[in-house]
């Protein structure tokens, strides 16, 4: 009877964190768009563009991409839309981070509100969650 050995490669979570970030910006309605009477619908999605690692910390660079649908102030009360993004860059401390470790960042949009300042200007307020985790590769030999 022969003893068989197999190598197993697994990923283990070394460290993780949770950071909630408030984002706020005012946006102007472009001259080509009609005036805003009422915001009908808003939605957003977080996109992570880059994750840089340092000694026990990471920098997450990304943007909140939003889309808005609004009712215009025209006589026919037609609908119009606009979209854009809000950039962010956050520094997050993570214990036990080393150069060869893999960092994965899970994101979620917790809250987003759009308020009308005037017919040509809107305020967007959002709270996003960044949940980075550090994974390391482990190779084990099983008999």
Predicted feature residues:
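Viral structural modules
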Residues: 1-143
């Amino acid at each position: 009877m022969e003893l068989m050995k197999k190598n197993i490669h697994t990923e283990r979570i070394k460290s993780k964190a949770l950071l909630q970030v408030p984002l706020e910006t005012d946006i102007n309605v472009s001259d080509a768009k009609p005036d805003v009477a009422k915001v009908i619908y808003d939605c957003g999605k977080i996109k992570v563009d880059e994750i840089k690692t340092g000694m026990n910390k990471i920098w997450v660079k990304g943007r909140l991409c939003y889309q808005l649908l609004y009712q215009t102030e025209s006589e026919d009360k037609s609908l119009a839309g606009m979209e854009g993004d809000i950039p962010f860059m956050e520094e997050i401390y993570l214990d036990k981070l080393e150069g060869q470790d893999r960092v994965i960042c899970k994101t979620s949009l917790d809250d987003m509100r759009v308020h009308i300042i005037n017919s040509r200007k809107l305020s967007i307020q959002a709270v996003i969650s960044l949940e980075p985790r550090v994974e390391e590769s482990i190779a084990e030999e099983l008999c």
